[in-house]
Design a protein with these regions (language model features):
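Substrate-binding/active-site clefts of carbohydrate-active enzymes
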Residues: 203-209, 217-404, 422-433, 437, ...
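Ser/Thr/Gly/Pro-rich low-complexity, disordered linker/stalk segments of secreted
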Residues: 694-742
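Surface-exposed beta-strand/loop patches in extracellular or lumenal glycoproteins
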Residues: 7-9, 19-22, 139, 636-651, ...
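Active-site-proximal helices and loops of the catalytic beta/alpha 8
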Residues: 27, 31, 318, 395-502, ...
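Insoluble glucan recognition modules
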Residues: 1-136, 140, 176, 210-216
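Long, contiguous ectodomains of secretory-pathway proteins
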Residues: 214, 734-807
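Aromatic sugar-binding surface patches on proteins
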Residues: 45-52, 153-161
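Surface-exposed, short loops/turns at beta-strand junctions within beta-sandwich domains
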Residues: 55-59, 163-171
């Protein structure tokens, strides 16, 4: 107890304690410290003997217990030494004269940022503390809405922090506490300014990411000149080519960005980009050549894989994606290298004396079967517990991010690397770009088991390995139990600790394949149920992660080396599905349009059950955030389902189905009768309140269908009208007549609107006539924000929106 210059000694005989007879030793127990006998007192409340040695100073203390005349060493202290000819247990006490300071890499942050909190210990005089003498460093992040005891690794002396999106702007204090192994406590604090998040047009938050995972080599061949880039014959799209290169590349991704944008995704996850081994890892059983087309068998972390393209093509992909408001997520590996690369990687590092540092694990530092200290699939395993090795791996991956302005990383094999490495990696990336995020692949992770990788300064999200099981169970009839789990999951997720919801991946049988081969249903039924599974995924909290080809009903088995779950994307099939209004492709496109239009509801909203029946194969849930509530219905049966559900809206309110455009009116008892289509027809409804059937007494007119604007400038003009309203008030032409300044928007340029707003005086009213568009860009709202004025956007002769700058 360093704070009180005290050492507390305790003794208990477990056998006597189990017999409730420890008190029989009262008066017979003492501790001998540095030769001095000290009687111990029985503590009935804790059923143990204790003695406090006070007034201690820095030094070593040798002790043993005497129990009923017999000496005993401390059974829980392995350190022992001789003192005056007597074997003793040993403890150490140190009172360091230290000061502690804390600082941040950024003085200000918003809820989408990360920030590196650094701690520095300085000896005022005399001896300081070694890293091994620091027991714990914690930061109180409660003013940022997070953990009161955020742990910082003493070997790093810094950790990456974040902020909940519910925290109000303003200056926040972060107290920091350092405890040493001697019980001394050192405290300090630092401040950070939380600012309002300002999103430019087309920007989105981390928890609003809609991710599309493309195995780059299998997506689209945009440059045939790199198909046999190394001249070793590793390009083969034939029957035996399941584990060879197929030609997909950066140029192909670039050419298909418009397809992905139109589909509704905003983030593209691509497989690792670095150079991979060129040697054939032949499978003799099937006589099949296998190569590193997937990117996970790195041979050089400083070069691009030539099969994927040049540095210019990679930069062009990133630039083009960014110009379209999309982000690129690159898959990275820090756990292992490709087969046969031991000699190369062991030749890279040397210590201060010029001695080689082995980057690859050998028999001397392998623990057989251990997740972290053994190799995965016999791949060369990096010795990441060695700081020099970690530093090199972190440097390589940070340089790629910095050089090309990569937006996000998907981190492979998180389970197989120490948390200290991931913390160091996150710190390095955050210092370059506070907005940079990582989603980790921790095999088996889910909302109830994040393995300590969320909210701890390492990963910003984890891939949810539970979700495809949830989806499989849901569409095969176990609806209520899955809903139970999804509501718990909903409560566990926030913008700093996100889960990526995937149905299929490159490492597993696809969900559609499992429905046929595990759940034993027909191909046609599996295809239909994938629509319902997609609705479950897209409307759930967390980041939807689409696996390429899933949106056109493509799937297969994780059957190496054939890898039918990694087929080339079928662009011919896509064109067929575009022409079929009831195709799974059009289902995905519709649902993603709804997701993007109501992104705050789906990314952050509450989830509640409205109605559910396992026997009848349906459920209706509500997703609500702020003033918006959506009702999502799903039906896994082959026939449509008529359902009466209670709603929060008042009688007469018209609910519109964003999925097919149909409307339903709330009854006097605040119920609504809806039809959920059969699974083959999408099995989906998404209801939102549109209008009331009876106007207010002073408004003798019929409400008409209206379009709405979206505050982030990303309203979707889909056939389903999946557009989200801002927190504005719907008005009538009678109210609009008070406007004193009028601006007309002919096309989609709002420059004259912004100019009028900037020139307007306090208390002004402006009317904007929208002739050909109902999409209002974010910078228009930014120009209005904070100003004392009303701006009315007239969307039709019957309805308008009033935006108050102070609201």
């Amino acid at each position: 107890d360093g704070a009180n210059d005290t050492i507390h000694f305790y003794y208990r005989n477990d056998t006597l304690a189990a017999e409730n007879n420890l008190a029989s030793l009262d008066g017979k127990v003492s501790v001998v410290v540095n030769g001095q006998t000290c009687p111990m007192t029985y503590d009935a409340a804790n059923d143990r003997f204790g003695y406090d040695l006070t007034g201690v100073s820095t030094g070593d203390y040798y002790y043993y217990y005497v129990v009923d005349g017999t000496g005993e060493l401390d059974a829980f202290n392995s350190e022992k030494a001789d003192y005056s000819g007597k074997e003793c247990s040993v403890c150490h006490f140190k009172k360091a004269n230290m000061s502690v300071a804390a600082s941040l890499s950024q003085y200000a942050m918003d809820y989408n940022d990360n920030n590196v909190l650094s701690v520095k210990l300085t000896a005022k005089d005399g001896e300081g503390l070694e890293t091994s003498e620091i027991a714990a460093i914690t930061a109180d992040l409660s003013e940022l809405g997070l953990n009161r005891e955020f742990a910082i690794d003493p070997t790093l002396m810094e950790g990456t922090i974040s902020c909940l999106n519910t925290v109000a702007a303003g200056e926040k204090t972060i107290p920091v506490t350092v405890k040493d192994i001697y019980g001394n406590v050192y405290t300090t604090a630092t401040n950070v300014t939380v600012t309002e998040r300002k999103k430019s047009a087309g920007d989105f938050d981390w928890d609003e990411a809609v991710i599309y995972f493309a195995v780059t080599d299998r997506f689209f061949d945009g440059d045939a000149s790199n198909n046999d880039a190394y001249g070793v014959g590793d390009y083969n799209t034939g029957e035996k080519g399941g584990s060879s290169y197929h030609g997909g590349d950066f140029a192909g991704l670039n050419q298909k960005l418009d397809y992905l944008k139109d589909l509704g995704v905003n983030t593209i996850w691509i497989t690792p980009i670095v150079e991979n081994i060129t040697e054939d890892q032949h499978d003799n059983k099937t006589d099949t050549a296998t190569y590193g087309y997937h990117g996970y068998w790195a041979s050089d972390f400083t070069k691009l894989n030539k099969h994927l393209g040049t540095e210019q093509q990679f930069k062009a992909l990133l630039d083009a994606a960014h110009s379209k408001g999309m982000k690129i997520m690159v898959d990275v590996v820090l756990n292992h290298a490709g087969y046969g690369t031991e000699k190369y990687f062991n030749s890279i590092l040397t210590d201060a004396d010029g001695n080689s540092i082995s980057m690859i694990r050998d028999s001397n530092n392998t623990i057989s079967g251990d997740d972290k200290y053994d190799s995965l699939s016999d791949l060369p395993d990096f010795v990441t517990e060695n700081k020099a090795v970690t530093d090199q791996l972190v440097t390589w991956q940070t340089e790629w991010m910095s050089k090309y302005s990569i937006d996000y990383y998907r981190v492979d094999t998180v389970k197989h690397v120490e948390t200290t490495t991931w913390a160091a990696f996150k710190n390095s990336l955050t210092k370059v770009n506070p907005d940079f995020k990582m989603i980790g692949e921790y095999s088996g992770a889910g909302y109830a088991n994040n393995a300590g990788e969320l909210g701890t300064g390492t990963m910003d999200a984890l891939l949810d390995f539970d979700f495809n099981d949830f989806a499989q169970n849901f569409v095969t009839g176990n609806i209520s139990s899955v809903e139970n789990s999804l509501q718990k999951r909903n409560n566990a997720i926030n913008n700093t600790s996100v889960m990526g919801s995937f149905l299929s991946s490159h490492d597993e049988d696809t969900l559609q394949y499992k429905l046929v081969n595990e759940s034993k249903i027909s191909e046609e039924e599996a295809y239909n149920l994938m629509k319902v599974a997609a609705t479950l995924q897209i409307t759930a909290k967390g980041q939807p992660v689409l696996y390429y080809g899933e949106e056109i009903g493509q799937g297969g088995a994780n059957n190496w080396p054939l890898q039918t779950n990694r087929r080339d994307f079928d662009w011919t099939e896509l064109e067929k599905q575009k022409a079929d209004s009831n195709s799974i492709y059009n289902h995905y496109k519709t649902m993603l349009a709804i997701r993007n239009a109501y992104t705050d509801v789906f990314a952050r909203g509450n989830r509640s059950t409205v109605a559910v029946s396992d026997a009848d194969g349906y459920e209706v849930i509500s997703r609500s955030y702020g003033n918006n509530t959506l009702y999502v219905g799903m039906n896994v049966k082959e026939a449509e389902k008529e359902v009466v559900i209670p709603v929060a809206e008042s009688a007469g309110t018209v609910l519109k189905n964003l999925y097919d455009g149909k409307t339903y009116t709330v009854s006097a008892d605040r119920n609504v009768s809806v039809t959920i289509p059969a699974a083959k027809d999408g099995g989906t409804i998404v209801l939102t309140a549109e209008t009331k059937t009876e106007p207010a007494p002073d408004e003798k007119q019929d409400d008409k269908k209206t379009d709405t604007a979206e505050s982030n400038g990303n309203a979707q003009s889909s056939g389903n009208n999946a557009n989200q309203s801002t927190s504005a008030n719907k008005t009538t032409p009678k109210q609009e007549e008070q406007a004193v300044a009028e601006v007309t928007v002919q096309e989609e340029s709002f420059a004259n609107v912004i100019e009028a707003v900037n020139k307007a005086k306090t208390g002004s009213k402006i009317r904007v006539n929208l002739l050909k568009t109902t999409k209002i860009p974010a910078n228009v709202f930014e120009s209005i924000k904070g100003k004392d004025m009303n701006v009315t956007f007239k969307v039709s002769d019957q309805a308008s929106w009033i935006i108050n700058g102070k609201d």
